[in-house]
Design a protein with these regions (language model features):
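Conserved beta-strand hairpin/beta-sheet module of binuclear metal-dependent hydrolase folds
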Residues: 1-52, 156-165
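Short, glycine/acidic-enriched loop or turn micro-motifs at the edges of active sites
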Residues: 9, 25, 34, 65, ...
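Active-site neighborhood of phospho(di)ester-bond hydrolases with catalytic His/Asp-centered motifs
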Residues: 30-33, 56-63, 82-84, 146-148, ...
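Active-site metal-binding motif and surrounding structural segment of the metallo-beta-lactamase
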Residues: 39-86
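Divalent-metal (often Zn2+) His-rich catalytic cores of metallo-beta-lactamase-fold enzymes
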Residues: 77, 192-247
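Metallo-beta-lactamase
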Residues: 90-145, 151-217
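C-terminal regulatory/interaction regions
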Residues: 236-298
């Protein structure tokens, strides 16, 4: 059984999820959220009849702080953390990850949004290859390496359920599928390949960290909408890059573009605030500019 745990990020609902799976060997967790939501995580796990100490296996889709920022705290309680090989060094020695995040969010934003990040001992970090299967009790999870949003991204398949992290986008309270495009790894072509892989799987649901379950009947429409949105964002950004505009100049224009897109989808102001909480438009400016710089100057 899968339990969707709302981590109440920034005291708002439906923004960041973790997922608790019950197995014969005890509960396992997919995603941890940031350490700033560790208390809501603890309370949500307790609400399902477990303690955090019961969780010995944690699967993260990628090492961005909204997905894996509390992994160290679960490791301190004895959990093994399963992740992409490219992520191990950054979770074991997070100085570069912290420096990169601080450049994006600033010192104040780091503390307010993500809180503390500590190293995880190498022996508690289990790297998982593409299509490798991990067995926990009577449960198996299969790793699909799914780059595009991040080079260290894994979508975890449990039976006909897929925990898709950010590669399957953001969808809040029935709104449109939106692509999170933070720096430094955005690669449109790789992302499209990952979406083709997901489309090829036989699934009952896709579980989005931002936020919740997409049922089988809606999966292909959701992924098509996400891909179209990803291309729309990238194509909007290209002329601004080619004109040599700076991120500070582009950001308010892009924010207005995204808000207009959400308004056209009849997203309410309350929903818009949740989208911005999960996937702030300003964050994608640097990611898309970097994508075009790498693509056009290589």
């Amino acid at each position: 059984m899968i339990h969707v745990l709302d981590l109440k990020f920034q005291n708002k609902p439906d923004t960041i999820a973790a997922f608790l799976i019950e197995t014969s060997a005890g509960p396992i967790l997919v995603e941890t959220g940031p350490y700033s939501t560790f208390k809501p995580l603890k309370e949500a796990v307790q609400g399902k009849g477990y303690t955090l100490e019961d969780i010995k296996h944690v699967f993260i889709t990628h090492i961005h702080l909204d997905h894996a920022g509390a992994a160290w705290a679960l490791a301190e309680l004895g959990a093994t953390i399963y992740l992409h090989p490219f992520g191990k060094q950054h979770m074991n020695a997070p100085s570069k990850l912290l420096a990169s995040a601080t450049r994006i969010y600033g010192e104040e934003g780091m503390e307010r949004l993500w809180s503390t990040l500590k190293p995880i001992p190498a022996e508690q970090l289990k790297t998982v290859e593409h299509q490798e299967v991990i067995t926990v009790g009577d449960t198996t999870l299969k790793a699909w390496h799914t780059p595009g949003h991040a080079v260290h991204h894994i979508a975890w398949q449990w039976g006909e359920e897929l925990f898709a992290g950010d590669v399957a986008g953001v969808k809040i309270e029935g709104g449109p599928a939106m692509p999170p495009c933070p720096p430094p790894d955005i690669n449109i072509e790789h992302w499209q390949e990952s979406l083709r892989l997901i489309r090829s799987l036989k699934l009952n649901h896709i579980y989005l960290t931002h936020f919740g379950a997409i049922p089988a009947a809606q999966i292909h429409r959701h992924l098509d909408e996400l891909e179209a949105g990803l291309l729309r964002w990238a194509n909007w950004m290209r002329p601004h890059y080619e004109q040599g505009k700076k991120a500070a100049e582009i950001t308010p224009l892009f924010q207005a573009f995204v808000k207009q897109q959400l308004a056209a989808a009849e997203v309410t102001e309350a929903q818009y605030d949740l989208y911005e909480n999960a996937n702030p438009a300003w964050m994608s400016v640097a990611g898309l500019l970097r994508y075009w710089r790498k693509k056009l100057e290589q």
